[in-house]
């Protein structure tokens, strides 16, 4: 077996409509068609990467689990989020690898901005 890429990430959220708006309006994802699956959710895309939001009643965000978005300019990305009312940590350097900072979506899922050092 040879895997070619990650097709999508599935993310549980408390309110699919609210979180869909966040991922589209704040982070720049696009909505893509989603079949009726019998529960609320949304399929979103950024380029050829997909994010599937699944509404889970009583959802509580997991601790420590996260995924990262690569950015060319972490300060500009952080400023954009902050002007949209998103609380974002200060960027920190991780060894000789990258700059990173963290924020949460409306359901409390932890997300990361990641800029390669030297970029």
Name each model feature, range by range.
Residues 1-2, 32, 83-119:
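Vicinal oxygen chelate
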Residues 1-18, 65-67, 117-119:
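N-terminal beta-strand motif that seeds the catalytic metal site of vicinal oxygen chelate
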Residues 3-5, 59-64, 94-95:
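Short glycine-enriched loop/turn motifs at secondary-structure junctions
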Residues 3-5, 37-51, 104-107, 117:
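C-terminal "cap" of GNAT-fold acetyltransferases
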Residues 10-50:
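Core segments of cupin and vicinal oxygen chelate
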Residues 21-22, 80, 107:
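Structural preference for long, well-ordered alpha-helical segments within the folded cores
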Residues 37-40, 61, 95-99:
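Short acidic/glycine-enriched loop/turn segments that link adjacent beta-strands
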Residues 67-79:
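Mid-chain, well-packed structural core segment of small domains
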């Amino acid at each position: 077996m040879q895997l070619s890429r990650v097709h999508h990430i599935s993310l549980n959220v408390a309110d699919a409509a609210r979180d869909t708006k966040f991922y589209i309006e704040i982070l720049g994802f696009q909505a893509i068609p989603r079949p009726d699956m019998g529960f609320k959710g949304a399929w979103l895309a950024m380029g050829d990467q997909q994010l599937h939001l699944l509404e889970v009643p009583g959802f509580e965000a997991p601790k420590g689990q996260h995924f990262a978005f690569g950015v060319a300019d972490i300060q500009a990305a952080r400023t954009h989020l902050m002007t949209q009312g998103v609380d974002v940590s200060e960027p920190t350097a991780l060894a000789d690898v990258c700059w990173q900072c963290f924020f949460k979506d409306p359901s409390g899922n932890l997300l990361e901005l990641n800029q390669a050092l030297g970029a």
